Every structure is written in C-alpha cells, then in structure tokens.
Amino acid sequence: MDLEPWGPLYRKQDQDGSLDNIAVVSGDIPSPHPKNEPSQTSTLHIPRDSDLDSDIPSVPTALIIAWGLTLSSLTGDEVVGFDLLPFRGDYQDLGARPYHFLLKFGYREWSREAATTGMDLGSASSEGLPQGMGNRPQIAPSRFRNVLIIKQCSDAPGDSGSLESPSLGNVDKDEPTDAFRADMFISIQCGIGRTGIDVHCSFDPAFWTSENIRMILLDLSRNFKEVMRCGRDDTPLTCLEGMSPKGLDCVLRRNIIPPPPKMEACVHHRFQARCRQNPSALAIDAWDGQLTYAELDSLSSQLASRLVSSITICPRGFMGVLMEKSAWVPVAILAVLKVGSAFVFLDGSQPLQRLKIICAETKSQLVLSSAHYREKANTLGPPVLLVEKNQSGLGQAKENDSCPSLLEDYPQPQSQPQDTLYAVFTSGSTGEPKGAMVDHGAFCTMCGPQMAARPTTNVSPRVFQFAPHAFTVSILDYLGTLLQGGCVCVPSEEELRNNMAGAIEGLSANIVTMTPSMARVLDPTQTPSLQLVLLAGEMMAQCDLDKWSQCVRLLSLYGQSENAAGSMISEKSIVPRAPNTFETLTPGFQCWIVSQDNPHRLMALGEVGELLLEGPALGQGYMNDPIQTEDKFICRSFCLEYAHSGSPQSYRLFKTGDLVRYTPAGEIELLGRKGAEVKLRGQRIDLTEIEHHLRCLFPSATRVVADVIIPSDDIDGLHPVLAAFVQVDSVSRTGQSAEATFASPRPEFRAEAKAVLSGLCQTIPSYMIPMTIIPTEAFPFTATGKLDRRSLRQYASAMSRSDLLKYVTDDRGPVVTAVTPVEIIIHDACVEALGVSSDKVGMLDSFPDLGGDSLAARRMVSICRTKGLELAVADILAHSSLTSLAEKCSAGGGGAKQISQGVEMLDPFSTAKEEFLSHLPSFLPNADMIADVFPVQGAQRRAARAIDTFIFRLSGPVDADRLRDACQVLQQAHLALRSIFVPFYGKFMQVVLRVPPLDFTRRLLPDGTDLVKWAESIGQADKTQRPPSEEFVVRFTLAETAGTPDYSIFMMRLSHAQYDAGCLARIISDLWAVYEQKQLVVKSDFAQYARRAVQQTHLLSMEAFWRDLLAGTTGLTPLPVTGISAEEERTIIVQQRVELKEPPPTGISMATVVRGAWSWVLHQQTGNTVVVFNEMLNGRDVVPLEDTEPVVGACHSIVPVCVHFPLPQSGRTPRELLSALQEQHLASLTFTTLDRDYLIQNCTEWTSHQSGFILAYQNFPEICDLVIGEDLSCQWASQVLDLAEPGEAWVTATPLPGALQISLRVSTAAMDEQEANAWISALGQTIIRFLDSPDSVL
C-alpha cells in the first residue's frame, strides 16, 4: 500500500527510514496502572481483509493516524497529542518512557495532495527521546492523557499475545491539560496478528463508561479502514461520514421523545384568556406602579386604540419600544401585538447609530418611547409616540403633547400564529447587528413547557425582570410570566445598578433569570425571598454552584436568540452535577451533535461536535438575510433521515455554533463556541463585527483581530476581558510565525488607541468594546496557514491586566497603598471585584483604568455594602482615582453608612432619652408605655404643630371592620404613626408609644350631603383649632350617606411631623394592602433614620461648608411688604402650568433648572446682588437605610441656597448659572442633615431666624388610584394642609408629563394676587428661556 504522502513528515522524527520500522515491538508489556489503581478493559477485533494483506508494514502508520483522527473527533481539536509506546527494538534502553506525539490535522480540508502540509508528527517528544528528536512544547494540546501501544504478534491465529499495558514509568500523570482533567486516562493497545488486529482499551471507570469506550473503539476501527482505503485507492481522506448501527442507536435513544406539535395560538390572545381567568390578580409590580391583569389589558387596549388612530398601520410590520424598565413596558408590548404588529426592543443604553440601524432593518412604522428617551427617539427616523403616566394614575399615550381620550374599542386585525412576534438583534459578522425573528406559535409552544420547569414553592411566581431589553430573556420575563399568570417585578434602572439585592427584596421577587457573572455580584443571604434562580447566557463555574445551590433551587438554562425561550435545562440543587452539563431537554426541542464542518454527520457518544436544535420553537430566521438564514437554519439533514423514519413530522434544524459532547453519564456538556462567536458576561459577540469597526477606525492596520483572553493575574479565571490586536506598518514583521510578538507600549500608539476606543463607543454597545488594543508585530499561524487564535490567546493571557492596560492608559505612577479604613475597604473591594492580586491595585488608579466596567462596578458596590460602605456605580466609574473616591466617602458621600456603623452601638440620643424618662410628663404615667424617645430635628420641629387632613373617595362596598383593623395594623407597623411630640425644656421630643390608641370613626351623614366638602370643613376646623402636640393626632374617619351605600369618603388626619410628601404614597398603599390581607414588610423605621442622620451630622465636617457658602450674607432674601393690617391678611395661592418643549441641558436636572430660574427671578424682582432662599430636600437621598421603600416619617430638610449677582465672566449664560448651581447642590447633599437652627447659630452671622421664600421641587411618588379587590376603588379627592408659618412664602414645582405645575403660596402681607401672578409668570418664562436658550447671555 502506498502511503507516500505521510512519509516525509514521519522522517522528521528519524532520518534513517520510515516510521514503519520503529512503531512495532515484540515482547511482553507491563501494566500502565500504578499499584492499587482500579481499571477496566474493553476489546475489539478488526478482522483481517485485503487491506491488511496488501501492506502489512504500513499498518502501524495507519493505526497512529486513525487514533489521531479518533482523538480529534473526541476533543474537537485539530491538534491532538498522545504517547506512543514503545518505539524501537531498543525499548529497554529508553527506560520504558513513551514518545509524546503532537498531530496537527488539517483533515477538514484534507486531500491526498494537501496531506503533507496538513499533518506534522514531528513537533514534540518526551524527555526520554535521544538528542535531536525535538523538545516537548510549552503547551500540551492533549485534552486527556492517553497512550497508544502497537505490537507485532507472531502467535497463533486469532491470538495477539499478551497485550497488557506498559508501565508509564515516571511520566507526570498530573501534567496540566487544556480543558479535561489529567487523570482521565485511556490506554489503547493494538496487537497486529495473523487474523487481524486485537485492540484492548484500559480505562478508568471513574471517568468513562463501557458504552463510551465502545463507541471510541468503533470510531478507531472505522478511521483505520478509511486511512487504509485512502492510501490504497489514491482518494481524499474525508471527514469519515457514517456511524456504526450500534453507535447510531445509542445516539437516537437520547432523543426518543419527539417534540410536541407547534401550538396554533397568538401571545396576546393567550394573555387575554389569562385575564378572564383572574382579572384582579397582580400582573405588574414595578417601581413606578402596580397593574392587575384587568388593568394591564385595559391600558394596552387604550394604547392600541391610540396607535390605530395615530398612524396607518401596515399589517405584520414592526414597531420599536424605547423605554427604561417600567410598568408601562408590557403595556406598550401588548398594545403593539393587539394592532397586529411585531415589536423590537430598542435598548436606550446602546449607541444611537446602532438603534438607527435596527429601525431601518425592521422598517419600524413607529417608536413607542418613554419621556426619558424622547430626545433620542426623535432622532431615529420613525414617528414617535410617548407612553407615560397621567395624573390620575392611569396610562395614556401622548403625541406632540396632545392627549385625546383613549377608547378600548378599535378595529382588531386577525393575527396568525405564523406572524412574527418580535425580533432580537445580536452581534453580526458584517459589521451591523443581525435580527433574529420569532413567531407567535413558536413562543406559545415553548412558553407552557418552558415555564413549567420554573416552579416556586407554594407561592405565586413573582419574576424579577433583570435582563436588559436588548436580550431575549427580558421578553421571557415579561410575556412568559404573564402567560403563566405570574407577576412581573420591575425594578428601576438605578436600583439594578446600585442595589439589586434590595430591589429583589423590595419587590418580594421569588424567581430571577440572570447571568452567572451577575449572580457572583449578589449575596444569597441578602435575597431570602428568592426561591428559584436560573443562570443563563454564559458558562457556569463551580463557585456558582457552591454559592447558590444550597440556598435556592438552582437551574441552568440554555437557549439562543434564534429560538423561543430555552432548549435545555439542568437541575443543579437536588443532584450534584458539573456546572456546564444539561441533562434535560425542554419539551419543545430535540438536540443532535454533528460534525463541526458537516451538519450531515452525526457524532458518536463522547465525541465533540456542534449542537443542532430541532423543534417547533425555532425562530423564523434572520431579518433581510436569506443567505445566513439558509446557512444556519437547515431544512433537511441526511444524517437524521433514519432517525425520522416513521415519524409523523420533522422540523427545521438550527446550527447553534456551540461545541458540546455527551458525557459518560449521558448529559450534554457545553465546551465552548466555534468560529468567531464568543460569549462574554452573558453577551453573545461576533468578533468579526468588532474587527469590522476596528478596521474602519484603524485604516493603517494590515491585520485586525479581536478575542477574549484571561489576564495572568485573574486569580480565579472568572474575569475574562475583550482585547483587540492590530498589526500596523510601524510595528509589523514580514513572514509567518508560529509565535505571537507584541510591540511595547508607545505614547503615539496609545493616543491612537484611545481615539479608536472612543470611536467604537459611537457605533457598538459597551459590552463589545475591547478593554485594550495591542500592537502586534507578528501573528501566530498554524501549519496550514490559518491564524492560530488559540496561540494568540495564550500568548496574550501571559500578560497581567495592568500590562494589557498600558497600551491604552497613560504610564502608571507608583502603587500607593491604602491607609485609612475607608481606603482599605475600597481597595480590597476593587481587588475582589476585578479578580486581581492586591499588589496590582493602587489608590491613585481609577477603576476604569484598572479595566473595570459597569458589571465589575456593581460587584464592587455589593462587596462594599457587605462591609457597611454605601457606594453608587456612577461614583465608582466617575472618580479619577480610588483615593478621590475614598475622600468623597470620608467627606460624607457613600461612606456615611460605613462610618456610622463603626459607632452604631453609641446611641446619639441616649442622654436625651434617659433625661426624658427620668422626668416623665404627667400624662405619661409610666415608661412601659414608651417604645422609644428621641429629640425632634431640623425641619421636623417646625411641623410638630401642623395638622393635615387627606380625603379619598371610595367607590364600592367597604367592610368597615376590615378597614378599622387595617388602620390599626398600619399604625402599629410604622413607628412614626404611633408617635406624639412632647415639649420638653425648650425643645420637642418624639415619643413612640408601644400600643397607640386607635381613633377610627364611622359617620352616617344625611342624604344629599357633599361628602368631600364636609370632610374639608372638618379638616379646616382641625387646622384652626389645633390639638396639643402631645395628644395623639392620628385619626381615621369613614363617612357615608344612607342613600349612597356604595359611595363613601375616607379621611386620614396626621401631624406633619409624622410624614412628608416622600412617604405619603406608601402610607396609602400599605393601608389598602393590609385591607386586602397582605403582609407588610417594614425593614427600616424613622428612629433608625433619625439616629443615622445625627451620626452623620456629628461625624462629618459640615460647618466649614456652610460657613464658606454663606459668608458675607446677612440672612434670607426678605419678602416684600404691602403694609396691610393683620386683620386684613390672608393667604393666596397662584399657579401656572409651564409646557416644556426642550429637556434640561446635558448634566443638569430639572430641579436645578427651577432652582436657577427662581434665583434669577429673585434677583430681577428685588435688585439684590446676593439672593438667599431656602429649599426643601428629601433627606432619604443622603441617609442610607436598608429599606428600598421610602421610610415613613418627616425626613425632609430645609437648607439655604445662595447665588451672587452679577455673575462672573464665566457664568453669564443660563447653562453656566445652572452648572454652578448643580455643583452647589451636589456638594451640599452630604451636609443637609445639619439642623437648621444649629446651622444659623454656628455657620452664619445672621442676627435672627428670618423667614423668606422656600422652594420645593416635588418629585415625589404619586398617590395613584387603587383598585382593591374586585369591586372597590380608592381615588384621591382633596387635602387640607397647614404648611406655612408667618412670614413664609412657598414656591413649588411639580413635574408633569411634558410640563411643570408651578405655584406660589404667599400672604397678602407680602404681595397681592396681581403681584403674585406676576412673580409666578416670571418664573415660568425664565424656566422656558433657560431650557430653550441655555447659551444666551443673561
């Protein structure tokens, strides 16, 4: 037989002849297993035929090649390694040590002519080889240790002699390997005899089953025959199509259950069926509101009506949804579906150019946008329709600030199950994102079986909506949960960034799907409400199992954008399993493992191949890309014709690009991805898209490569980074090399690399932007001339994170160590979040320059929180160094919580409390009545005598006893609501009663009584005849008339020292939640808030800030004086609605716009060169507490704002004025807990406590209309407030959709109604001017 094509390659090993002369040895061979190590054997006989007769000396050569091919199929590698034992007749002289071989296969492109360059048998040797035979390489491609033994037998026919395994001598059995464990040992012993070849395999049963080994031997036999045929017939050596019948039966048994038929249903129809089953069940529980199934159905129908009336809808077209996480996202989705369209999520965090491409690809007819993204939506091209919340708490669509009434009746198109439901855009190879489409029927088919695998324990599913809108899981969170009758729990974007654990607990979520990277950020002990955690999007690690499997039910989910929901799922809590194995197929799929290069060839058990999915839940394909759709979605596979013989139906198949294999236990093990697609922190990235944009920005580059690497100092290997490699003329080296060579960092290249990274930010999402760009002198290539990505990754991974960053960041100074307690916490958290060694992080480094991204910042926030330090993601990413971040914390920013916890045991009120308890007032007979005592602080003191009344309309029957019980529970739950305010030696003390009295009255009024006016009169009487503050003022009243039993009024009277506008909505919602027999969860109370605020006040240096700000001032800007008598004085209120056409300038809040406009009006109206006024702020923003819900209590503070006129040269435009005020506001936030009286006495030269104007920007939670049960609703009716003190004037601004409501409450002793209207009009005009012309000269 002529095997000449392989001859020259073998001769690289030995110059004196062919391998045929050295690959055969006679004699007995001892066993390879160390003493006492268990092993099992399996045998196979390859019978003698014409091949063996033709060229017996070449048989050993063919066996070596066949074993290499078998290993390549088993591992999926083109480079495989094994030990060949023994080699010559002088075997004993070699000390029984094997030759180590590396076979480099190019067999996927093999032909007889290419074979000489497609293999290289001479690239490795063991240490026992004679000199000149080559050196062992630095990296061993063997995925498990294995040895091939070939022996010529001269025994009787059919007897190959004693084929026991040889001794391995001192071969290092624990040598590190590429992916598999080193002790996964196999020994293949081939005895060439007269009747054929007897193959004996010794293997470790701990890692291999007999069935797996049997399949391996069958592969070896088939490969051997194919190699012999190739040499004999002078034909190409192909990919060896075909499988033995036994092997095929084993594979088919893995898919014995066929997928179900495709469901003929539409998503919105199934949702409406859910609504009919349980209309009052809670569907959405979001940070901005709650919706029942009936409300969600009604609101989406209203919005659908608006869509129909706004544009001419093209049937089965697309509409974009550009909204932050909100209760209104599912309203928008369902509205789009109800008008017969499909939707595509537009993630507002992605670059504008990418969103424009998505809109163009989908030919979006309309973009449904929130007010937050209105400006961005208007630049995308399609018409924009705003979806937002109106004052009454219902949803409405709004276009061009016009709000026509919405009707639920509209022409409904006949949607079909085969219609597209949604499109999801992922990274694409052409430089632009590719859109995968899924139809209604596919989603409905998977939704039932898929969600059935996500049960909780004895409670209704409450699914936490974590995934960004750009990813498929977010659609499963919304629609999948709704179709199952569960509740979608929607956090705010800010909560996700800074306190995800708090958001989960605040919403009482019990299910979440997230990436393993995100799961590593959370602490299971901080999320006790979670019962089921699904990890998806990337490979799990053992640490993920160790962390979560004992705390929750842990599932691993596998799926892709090209199919609905997931296709494989694995239980990780009940049965111990490897992290990346899947034992269960979801009922909508069958899985097949095929050759990476030939989808028509099935792989045997244990062999590595590409995963193919088959089933009714596959998507429709790629939008506007028939070529790629045809490539990835296979209509027919020859290898499955036998599998489907007699089957009633078969489906298309999808080539996933994921490399997998069957484990010995029969599970599917996920090994990685083939080609240029990678997974990084749950994001699927096509590297060629990044390379496309790099080429555009690096025109001088001759070669550009992007890949994922693991820095050498990544301790646990869980923090891979994306790196780019560019070869430019200035650093290139001619010719091809087997090694990668990188240039040194230079300032010129660093500047160019920074510019390129900045340019990438404008075109691709942040998760696709490389952390570094490395100038590469030479790229490594394989023997076949291909780019060797594996070697490139390995060479780059030899660099540390700091080495990689030197190419894109300025030269690093000395590593400065942490000194203070706060610095040590920040330093250690940064080290842990980035997964680097401690000496790599210095306090002068910035977090982004260390390679930190937003996910790592979240991890750092979580770590700091466990150590008592509160930080925000934005702070971590914004600060120029860890030192400046620590200084901010030490100055009272995020570090306030950590510092105060250090003295948590020292109660700042202990002295005052002891003094009060030792001198109890007579109306408090004993201390047992008292739960707590502490001094009233700041703005709360001025509100201790104010009595406010709130009035609500109730429609429907009310159970008065249940309402009375609910009032009692509410009062007991919130500490502030069981407090009285007692004068004590010139100050007020807040006394918390253990069991307060319940003042609940039910009034039956004469028919015809105007209940609202009656309630207002009661409130006015309470305001005029204020009860003493030491009396318990909380009172609840239910009033009704005999003639209208289903209509009543509910009144609630509170002291303004017990609440503020920031918690009023919570008080109302908690009351009716208790009425519906729901359990209240109160994690933080007002006593904790008061103590924490005082601790910050005493620990932080506040006085210097206020002294500097108020230096030279003599007091608040005084109110004007009209001169009327006290008898004629009255309070007037004027207000105006300001329509807003432009958003605030970048970086400026709307509150700052109002603040700046009011300071300008004061300057213009009074002519004062210095204006000083008070502003009411929400103290909850600066006092960290555990509860994500607003603490019930008077947490507001009143602080001065000071502006000097005329403005300096650098501040003569509105933009500059607003920037200065924004900086003043941000700087003052950490100092707002200082008591106002103390501030005036110790930080100013003011002679008296003057009154003046108080500005309040009332961006507080809205009191929404509530639906209680099936037939009771609660609506806001009126209020009677007791706010102003003599000499005060209140200026308020309340944000509305597209507008501001501004008002002025002032005494006629300061101005008459005409003057008040002039002032408020001036404020409105100034706000518009500042927004429309921020760069005009003042």
Curated annotation (Swiss-Prot):
| One Pfam family it belongs to | AMP-binding
Task: State the GO CC annotations.
Answer: cytoplasm
Q: Give the region (Condensation) as residue ranges.
A: 949-1336
Q: What is known of its domains?
A: NRP synthetases are composed of discrete domains (adenylation (A), thiolation (T) or peptidyl carrier protein (PCP) and condensation (C) domains) which when grouped together are referred to as a single module. Each module is responsible for the recognition (via the A domain) and incorporation of a single amino acid into the growing peptide product. Thus, an NRP synthetase is generally composed of one or more modules and can terminate in a thioesterase domain (TE) that releases the newly synthesized peptide from the enzyme.
Q: What induces it?
A: Expression is regulated by the secondary metabolite regulator cclA.
> What are the entry keywords?
Ligase, Phosphopantetheine, Phosphoprotein
What follows loss of this gene?
Impairs the production of deacetyl astellolides A and B and leads to the accumulation of trihydroxy confertifolin.
What this protein catalyses is: 7beta,14,16-trihydroxyconfertifolin + benzoate + H(+) = dideacetyl astellolide A + H2O; 7beta,14,16-trihydroxyconfertifolin + 4-hydroxybenzoate + H(+) = dideacetyl astellolide B + H2O
Locate the Carrier domain: which residues?
820-893
Provide the protein name. Nonribosomal peptide synthetase astA
Q: Which residues carry this modification: O-(pantetheine 4'-phosphoryl)serine?
A: 854
GO molecular function terms attached to this record: ligase activity; phosphopantetheine binding
Q: Which SUPFAM superfamilies match?
A: Acetyl-CoA synthetase-like, ACP-like, CoA-dependent acyltransferases
The UniProt record lists the EC number as: 6.3.2.-
- What role does this protein play? Nonribosomal peptide synthetase; part of the gene cluster that mediates the biosynthesis of astellolides, drimane-type sesquiterpene esters that show antimicrobial, anti-inflammatory, and anti-tumor activities. The first step in astellolide biosynthesis is performed by the sesquiterpene cyclase astC that catalyzes the formation of drimanyl pyrophosphate from farnesyl pyrophosphate. Drimanyl pyrophosphate is then dephosphorylated by the sesquiterpene phosphatase astI to produce drimanyl monophosphate which is further dephosphorylated to drim-8-ene-11-ol by atsK.
Superkingdom of origin organism: Eukaryota
InterPro entries linked to this entry: ACP-like_sf (IPR036736), AMP-bd_C_sf (IPR045851), AMP-dep_synth/lig_dom (IPR000873), ANL_N_sf (IPR042099), CAT-like_dom_sf (IPR023213), Condensatn (IPR001242), PP-bd_ACP (IPR009081)
State whether keyword rRNA processing applies: no
Which Gene Ontology biological process is one annotated for this entry? Answer: secondary metabolite biosynthetic process
* Sequence segments annotated as region (Disordered): 22-52
For the region Adenylation, what residue ranges are annotated? 271-681
The family line of this record is:
Belongs to the NRP synthetase family.
Record organism: Aspergillus oryzae (strain ATCC 42149 / RIB 40) (Yellow koji mold)
Q: Does Manganese appear among the keywords?
A: no
Q: In which pathway does it act?
A: Secondary metabolite biosynthesis; terpenoid biosynthesis
